[in-house]
């Protein structure tokens, strides 16, 4: 933590967590900028039209949020956004705006894969004027970042630009433009640009963002000044750097921003529900339901609009298990018996691995049972039994529980039971999702109970992928299961 005044930071927030996070940041003394109309209606406060020091946007899968901005602001936001015991976060290895000399490792039909040193990015052929081949070095900039748990890759471009939130400098000549649908506001802003007394450097053109149409002259001047300084700094770095073609390995050249990704687990979503409930009508499990599906999200909005202030918003237990209507949600949106449901196995390092899909064989008020027929090859982890074609795995996931059992069977024989300790399980319509906490408890076919992989949990703590409170919870759950089994 830098100890900077929170009021010196401004955040732009978008996505399903916006109301909750607006409450969170305002309570911490931050400025919230470029607020949407629903947010302006819900909060009795003035929202400044100034350049954000960070943006916080919900990921496309609604699993969490990505934060991009100045390193100091990102660090301070990280402390705020760790809202629950099952919030996990990871540094963005390739923040938006980073300039890197990368190596082409593969070409696809419409683009190329580029080794950035820290991860692999994707360069669409439309984003480069030059033909690229495997093995070549290319200078690229990160346009869009990607959460570590998704299959997406950072989106790259060979055009290098700079941006300060309100003002972007493009590497081309021309008059200023405004990225807005409000033609009158755009004309006014273009006219005001000449009065700022700040000119774009040679070879750069000004493009204002829509939020700039509501900003004061002082704010516009400050944003443009910072963009000019950033462009001059970047130009100096690139002038001093050898051509990308002269390098043999990926090399980072420029990064004004930092980034961080936040995975919200089930308990964290209920904390966010509470923040949102302090502002407006919020059903139990609001964020949990919205994460599941588009149709479910629309259903929540409708229910809250119909209930309005008549909804008390009271919850009867700490984590919301008693008040979250899982069976009602599952009846409406799934999963149902016969459905195929994927097992989304999150890892503490940020990856999300599919363990395959299973058929729903049973579903009650709080749990889903999946059955998978397995193929032969290898052995069952920790059971030391060869895997054969036709073996059956039966897994029961209870919504909100910190563990789940998988029973492995061959014909009528039980080979063993593998109990995975994880963050509270969420049973969505198409997938079950959680983060594996490494330590597991095994019950062998002969009745012997064994606890495994404590060392992997310790390694995750040492790597700062799992915080100590979460690790201690995992150990406690494992100890209780050892006794119970």
Please state what every model-predicted region is.
Residues 1-8:
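Terminal disorder- and signal-encoded targeting elements
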Residues 2, 16-19:
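Extended, Lys/Arg-rich, non-catalytic nucleic-acid recognition/anchoring regions
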Residues 2, 39-86:
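Long, continuous compositionally biased terminal/linker segments
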Residues 9-13, 61-69, 177-178, 206-208:
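Short cationic amphipathic helices and targeting signals
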Residues 70-72, 86-350, 359:
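Single-stranded RNA-binding surfaces
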Residues 179-194, 406-442:
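Short, internal acidic amphipathic alpha-helical interface segments
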Residues 381-424:
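Phosphate/ribose-recognition catalytic cores of enzymes acting on nucleotide-derived substrates
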Residues 436-482:
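A hydrophobic, small-residue-rich beta->alpha segment in the mid-to-C-terminal subdomain
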């Amino acid at each position: 933590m830098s100890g900077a005044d929170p009021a010196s930071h401004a955040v732009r927030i978008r996505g399903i967590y916006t109301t909750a996070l607006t409450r969170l940041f305002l309570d911490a003394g931050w400025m919230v900028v470029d607020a949407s109309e629903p947010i302006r209606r819900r909060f009795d406060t003035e929202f400044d039209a100034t350049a954000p020091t960070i943006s916080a946007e919900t990921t496309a899968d609604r699993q969490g949020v990505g934060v991009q901005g100045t390193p100091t602001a990102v660090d301070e936001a990280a402390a705020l956004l760790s809202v629950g015991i099952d919030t996990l976060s990871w540094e963005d290895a390739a923040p938006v705006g980073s300039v890197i000399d990368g190596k082409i490792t593969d070409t696809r039909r419409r683009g190329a894969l580029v080794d950035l040193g820290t991860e692999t990015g994707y360069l669409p052929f439309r984003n480069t004027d030059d033909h690229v081949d495997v093995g070549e070095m290319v200078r690229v900039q990160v346009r869009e970042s990607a959460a570590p748990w998704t299959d997406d890759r950072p989106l790259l471009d060979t055009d290098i630009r700079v941006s300060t939130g309100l003002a972007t400098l493009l590497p081309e000549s021309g008059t200023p433009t405004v990225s807005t649908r409000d033609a009158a506001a755009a004309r006014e802003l273009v006219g005001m640009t000449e009065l700022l007394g700040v000119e774009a450097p040679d070879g750069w053109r000004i493009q204002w963002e829509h939020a700039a149409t509501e900003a004061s002259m002082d704010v516009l001047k400050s944003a443009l000044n910072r963009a000019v300084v950033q462009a001059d700094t970047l130009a100096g770095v690139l002038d001093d750097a050898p051509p990308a073609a002269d390098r043999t390995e990926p090399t980072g050249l420029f990064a004004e921003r930092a980034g961080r990704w936040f995975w919200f687990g089930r308990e964290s979503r209920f904390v966010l529900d509470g923040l949102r409930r302090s502002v407006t009508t919020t059903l139990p499990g609001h964020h949990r339901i919205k994460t599941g599906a588009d149709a479910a999200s629309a259903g929540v909005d409708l229910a809250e609009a119909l209930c309005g202030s008549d909804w008390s918003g009271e919850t009867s237990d700490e984590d919301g298990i008693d008040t979250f209507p899982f069976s009602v949600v599952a009846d409406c949106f799934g999963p149902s018996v016969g459905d195929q449901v994927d097992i989304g196995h999150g890892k503490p390092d940020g990856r999300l691995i599919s363990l395959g899909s299973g058929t729903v064989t049973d579903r009650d008020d709080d749990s889903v049972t999946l059955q998978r027929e397995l193929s032969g090859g290898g052995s069952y982890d920790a059971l030391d039994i060869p895997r054969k074609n036709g073996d059956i795995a039966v897994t029961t996931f209870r919504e909100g529980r910190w563990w789940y059992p998988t029973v492995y069977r061959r014909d009528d024989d039980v080979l063993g039971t593998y109990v995975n300790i994880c963050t509270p399980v969420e049973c969505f319509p198409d997938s079950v999702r959680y983060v594996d906490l490494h330590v597991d408890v095994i019950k062998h076919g002969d009745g012997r109970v064994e606890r495994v992989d404590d060392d992997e949990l310790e390694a995750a703590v040492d790597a700062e992928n799992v915080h100590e409170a979460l690790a201690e919870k995992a150990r406690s759950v494992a100890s209780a299961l050892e006794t119970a089994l």
